[in-house]
């Protein structure tokens, strides 16, 4: 019986510890392309577009880049056009 009581006590402590913790949520920053003096999204600006492409050449999602949905669509279209015009590579080579 002692073993079962100890097991239930430790389980109660674990549950109590979970409820005692406060969860901290980080406040999301705004869209970096919606602020005043932000660069214009254009397929002719590969320096800007390459910031939103991963090391392997894939477009980064907005949850990583914190770009709003409207600007994310413009970015995706600009990256696709820049790839077709050979301003950006489709796949980056590993170094």
From Swiss-Prot:
Subunit structure: Part of the 30S ribosomal subunit. Forms a tight heterodimer with protein bS6.
InterPro entries: Ribosomal_bS18, Ribosomal_bS18_CS, Ribosomal_bS18_sf
Signal sequence, renumbered to the chain: none
One GO term (biological process): translation
Biological function: Binds as a heterodimer with protein bS6 to the central domain of the 16S rRNA, where it helps stabilize the platform of the 30S subunit.
Stated family: Belongs to the bacterial ribosomal protein bS18 family.
Single annotated GO MF: small ribosomal subunit rRNA binding
Record's protein name: Small ribosomal subunit protein bS18
Lineage: Bacteria, Pseudomonadati, Pseudomonadota, Alphaproteobacteria, Rickettsiales
PANTHER family for the chain: 30S RIBOSOMAL PROTEIN S18, SMALL RIBOSOMAL SUBUNIT PROTEIN BS18M
Keywords from the named record: Ribonucleoprotein, Ribosomal protein, RNA-binding, rRNA-binding
HAMAP family: Ribosomal_bS18 (MF_00270)
Pfam family, one: Ribosomal_S18
